[in-house]
Amino acid sequence: MSVTLVTASGMGVSAHRVDEYLQAARIAIDPDRVQLELDLTPGIALAETILADIDRDHDGSLSSEEQRAYGRLVLDALTVDIDGTPVRAELASAGFPGADEIRRGEGTVRLQLTAALPGLSSGVHHLRFRNRHHPDRSVYLANALVPASDRVSVTAQRRDANQTELTIDYTLRAAPVRPPAAWLLGGLVAATALSALAIRPLRSFR
């Protein structure tokens, strides 16, 4: 996924306070799907609270199952819709720091999500993303990434005051018409020649 932002928000990811849970979302739109990167960084004052959400058996380690469970918990708090129609996002991958890194306020949970889009006509479309995960003492950032496909052009981004909601206006261009393959053209030429021979009137011998 490209990491180039269409526009950058005013707050750097590393500038969050110790008593905040920074949630930074980056969204990439392709013609047939949307990909989301979500970085979750708790400050020192919130570290134990977030760790308790992840480390459900309280053994001090973050097991693969606990990581997946927390990823699903975050996913349940996110919504994505295209032109008002909800689309289902799925957790593609998750990266978790160690518990000690989180306690020091240096650990970032990185989630990658993907959602298939319905067949869309060319023209203007609107994708809306909402994040309702852990609203207490969280700070949200949301930005669109520069599309990888030249068929997609982001034209505007609209956020609510807290950046829990981002609407991306974009234009989708029609897929280019591909010329027929050379072998297909050759086959058509041969078929045309054979057809011409088949319909040629036979001459009688005198």
Where are the predicted features?
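Bacterial N-terminal signal peptides
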Residues: 1-8
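N-terminal soluble domains immediately following signal/targeting peptides that reside
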Residues: 12-189, 195-196
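Juxtamembrane interface at the cytosolic side of transmembrane helices
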Residues: 194-206
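Compositionally biased amphipathic helical and low-complexity segments enriched in hydrophobic
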Residues: 6, 118-121, 203
